[in-house]
From Swiss-Prot:
Higher taxonomy: Bacteria, Pseudomonadati, Pseudomonadota, Alphaproteobacteria, Caulobacterales
GO biological process assignments: leucyl-tRNA aminoacylation
NCBIfam families: leuS_bact
EC number: 6.1.1.4
Gene Ontology, cellular component aspect: cytosol
Superkingdom classification of source: Bacteria
Protein name: Leucine--tRNA ligase
Gene name per UniProt: leuS
Protein's organism: Caulobacter vibrioides (strain NA1000 / CB15N)
Length: 861
């Protein structure tokens, strides 16, 4: 018996696929139904990791399966290639971002090809290719012309050492994530996209995405944050500050709690706060301290609540005899609503934390059902549930929603404000003070202002002759690139030196894949054919930003006439991460798994260093990461076990939407399965054998094989790859129960049929092994071109049926009967069932109704 050797087999079949160009996408008019499967394209870090293996193996299963079903499959690959890591490499290693990026792409391309994925590499591109980002610049200018792109001064996080703007998530404890410098708040002129113009469409469009995970749709809905509430103004008690004669405008989603107001709060960046700070050093200091804190919403939410009493007071809009203090508070966001709130501590946790700290009143106005208004109080947690309004004059007795409506009506009737819809979503700031990004294609002219670069001068390409020996943006100090002439007046002008947020690059790449040679940004005919993507696969960490921006840009490009679809991804699957135990030595230093030896005695596991024998601490199971060294190199696994074993393991150990824990024992189990599988193919003798279904062993094997088709098909369709693999494992036992050695002609015929089916069913999971097995069986051509097997309904049908039994309409048990059993036989079995007999005790059976192979209804009294 020939031993299966993946080191020889796997490269051989990858070469055969490449030579035959089997994965090249067919023409859009070739008559086959289309199927577009796409995994989120990778950043070219230089090496693939096990997360990549899982992600792309899943996509490959779908692509190969659909191809076998007769679909014209588009399964492309590209590179999300702009971004900070390349600039960091330039600064730290003295290499050019361009060279570093393309070297990494070359390395990762070979690694991904070694995975055996069925990608049409002829459509490959990187977002740093001038051909790609030139097309991006072209549609950007169209959006600029339409007014969807604009500039405005905005408050940003400025790193004074790296001399660049940081996203909120890059500010850690008030310091730059890379430099460690204290971050400053500055106002800079930035470029924005009006994503808020599409807020309603983006929320409403979520209802059409029935093949998206509910949690992702909910995350996007919450991120957009459409809320209906009240916008109104507090009048100042006494003289109003400059420019505030008309009052202090606030927005609230809880007008029902107005009578529970304890104070009014404004953001540290609010114009009133800045006005007061100009004349008050203490307020200046307080605002400066607020700016040192974290700037992400999560950090602001969890930070200690801090405030400063301005000394100003405002009048309650529904009862002017009540006045409220105005505080500057660090938890209020300037870019939500108006940057000012009224605070009702009894019914908002942040307000309550603040009120407790500064000894401000807590006035409950929503009474939970069943509580006594005379004794109800609020403790450590604010009450945010339903109830009846009390302590609120004319609102008393109303439920929350009715009270909201009444409060809005009263405010509107008094011309003090109006009901309003507000969004948490802000316009998308796309300016980045970076070199390694897509240049913004505009020119600044003193005479003409902002002038778009003419389309025939695109792409505006990045200059190669830049240095990274100084902090800041190299484009800003380039001796020639920055300086140009105005396309409008011919005078001296300067190029825009900001580059675009890399989320722009990934917001439309799926559309470019439809026709990578199109002269327009998007080949309309091809895009109309291929879009939307039928199945998109990627990590849930991209649930909000990337997916939201892609949905927005798709709608914007549709409005430009470049696309015909509103939603880019019809189906979305978010796979879990690949995890591994993390290990430390006694000094607290992370240790790689390859340097750890683990022994198990009973339920106790201990670890030591493989080389030194020193004790090792076994830590938690965590996402594989370089920082914790709990990574397993895919190439090492491929070398030791073969690619197919690695592919099989990442899809077999847990449901694909959950994390999978990498273990050596797990991949060894997959390796053993591939060898057992091969042995079944290798042991089958050549020849034509006649079927004989009177042979019970042969018939049982045929039935198992045809049932397997349905199981595996359903598992792929439902993204339950682990269930499909489990069925393949089970079927191997059925094959072993009918060995070739000494078998009858009927069993050999059944085995030949079963192995023919099996080779095609395992092909999406273990494609190299499947090709070798197909060739060993004498299959026509390659298995990659073979059609998906179709089950014989007679053979795939269950021999038995489980029938529920109802007595007078209530389920009282179930019985097993042969499929198609006569009614009288079913009745006899049902009435003899002990559970049924117990429920019929003392009753007379009047009628038994048998619904063939489905249910038994008994009428008795």
């Amino acid at each position: 018996m020939a031993r299966y050797n993946p080191k020889d087999t796997e490269p051989k079949w990858r070469e055969a696929w490449a030579k035959a160009d089997v994965f090249k996408t067919g023409e859009i008019n070739d008559g086959r139904p289309k199927y577009y499967v796409l995994e989120m394209f990778p950043y070219p870090s230089g090496r693939i990791h096990m997360g990549h293996v899982r992600n792309y193996a899943m996509g490959d299963v779908v692509a190969r399966y659909k191809r076998a079903q007769g679909f014209n499959v588009l399964h492309p690959m590209g590179w999300d290639a702009f971004g900070m890591p390349a600039e960091n490499a330039a600064m730290e290693r003295g290499v050019h971002p361009k060279g570093w990026t393309y070297d990494n792409i070359a390395a990762m391309r070979e690694q991904l090809k070694s995975l055996g994925i069925s990608v049409d590499w002829s459509r490959e591109f990187a977002t740093c290719d001038p051909e790609y980002y030139g097309k991006q610049q072209a549609w950007f200018l169209r959006l600029l012309k339409r007014g969807l792109v604009y500039r405005k001064e905005a408050s940003v996080n400025w790193d004074p050492v790296d001399m660049t703007v940081l996203a909120n998530e890059q500010v850690i404890d008030g310091k730059g994530w890379r430099s460690g410098a204290v971050v400053e708040k500055r106002k800079l002129t930035q470029w924005f996209l009006r994503i808020t113009d599409y807020a309603d469409a983006l929320i409403d469009g979520l209802k059409t995405l029935d093949r998206w995970p509910d949690k992702v749709r909910l995350m996007q809905e919450n991120w957009i944050g459409r809320s209906k509430g009240l916008r109104f103004k507090f009048q100042f008690d006494g003289e109003a500050p400059d420019g505030m004669a008309e009052g202090l405008e606030v927005y609230t989603t809880r007008p029902d709690t107005l009578f529970g107001a304890s104070f009014v709060g404004i953001a540290p960046e609010h114009p009133l706060a800045e006005q007061l700070a100009a004349a008050n050093p203490q307020i200046q200091t307080f605002i400066a301290d607020c700016r040192k804190g974290g700037t992400s919403e999560a950090e602001i939410e969890s930070a200690e609540k801090l405030g400063y009493d301005t000394g100003l007071r405002v009048k309650h809009p529904l009862d002017p005899s009540i006045t409220l203090p105005v505080w500057i508070a660090n938890f209020i966001l300037m870019d939500y609503g108006t940057g000012a709130i009224f605070a009702c501590p009894a019914h908002d946790q942040r307000d309550l934390d603040f009120a407790r700290k500064y000894d401000l009143p807590v006035l409950p106005v929503v009474l939970p059902n069943g509580e006594d208004p005379a004794t109800f109080t609020v403790g450590k947690e604010a009450y945010v549930g339903p109830g009846k309004i009390f302590n609120s004059k004319f609102l008393d007795g109303l439920d929350v929603e009715a009270a909201k409506a009444e409060a809005i009506a009263r405010i509107e009737a008094a011309n003090q404000g109006q009901g309003a819809t507000v969004y948490r979503l802000r316009d998308w700031g796309v300016s980045r003070q970076r070199y390694w990004g897509c240049p913004i294609p505009v020119i600044h002219c003193e005479a003409c202002g902002v002038v778009p670069v003419p389309e025939d001068q695109l792409p505006v390409a990045l200059p190669d002759d830049v240095t990274f020996d100084k902090p800041g943006n190299p484009l800003l100090r380039h001796p020639t690139w920055r300086h140009t002439t105005c396309p409008s007046c011919g005078g001296k002008a300067e190029r825009e030196t900001d580059t675009l947020d890399t989320f722009i690059d990934s917001s439309w790449y799926f559309a470019r894949f439809a026709d990578t040679q199109a002269a327009e940004p998007v080949g309309k005919d091809a895009a109309d054919h291929w879009l939307p993507v039928d199945q998109y696969i990627g990590g849930v960490e991209h649930a909000i930003l990337h997916l939201l921006y892609a949905r927005f840009i798709t709608r914007a490009l549709k409005d430009e006439g470049l696309l015909s679809v509103e939603e880019p991804f019809a189906g979305l699957f978010t796979q879990g991460m690949v995890t591994h135990e993390a290990y430390k030595n006694e000094a607290g230093e992370w240790v790689e798994p390859s340097d750890v030896v683990i022994t198990t005695e009973g339920s106790t596991r201990t670890a030591k260093h493989a080389k030194t024998g020193a004790p090792i601490i076994i830590g938690d199971i965590e996402k594989m990461s370089k920082s914790k060294k709990n990574v397993v190199a895919p190439e090492d696994i491929f070398e030791a076990y073969g690619v197919d074993s690695a592919r099989l393991f990442v899809m077999s150990d847990s449901p694909p939407e959950r994390d999978v824990q990498w273990t050596n024992s797990g991949v060894e189990g997959s390796w053993r399965f591939t060898h057992r599988l091969w042995n079944e193919f290798d042991s089958q003798p050549a020849g034509d054998f006649a079927h004989d279904d009177s042979d019970e062993a042969a018939l049982a094997l045929r039935k198992a094989a045809h049932k397997l088709i349905g199981f595996v098909t359903d598992s792929i369709e439902g993204f339950r790859f682990n269930s499909g693999v489990a069925r393949l494992y089970e079927f191997l036992n059925a094959l072993k129960a009918a060995p070739a050695e000494g078998a009858s002609q009927a069993v050999l015929a059944a085995r030949a049929e079963a192995l023919n089916i099996l080779a095609r069913l395992v092909a999406p999971f273990t494609p190299h092994l499947a090709e070798e097995a197909w060739a060993r069986m004498g299959g026509e051509g390659m298995v990659v071109d073979a059609p998906w097997p179709k089950a014989d309904p007679a053979l795939a049908a269950d021999d038995e049926r489980v029938l529920p039994i109802q007595i007078n309409g209530k389920r009282r048990g179930e019985i097993k009967v042969k499929a198609g059993a006569p009614d009288d036989e079913v009745t006899k079995i049902a009435l003899a069932d002990p559970n049924v007999m117990a429920h019929l005790e003392g009753l007379t059976v009047r009628k038994v109704i048998v619904v063939k192979d489905r249910i038994v209804n008994i009428v008795a009294n």
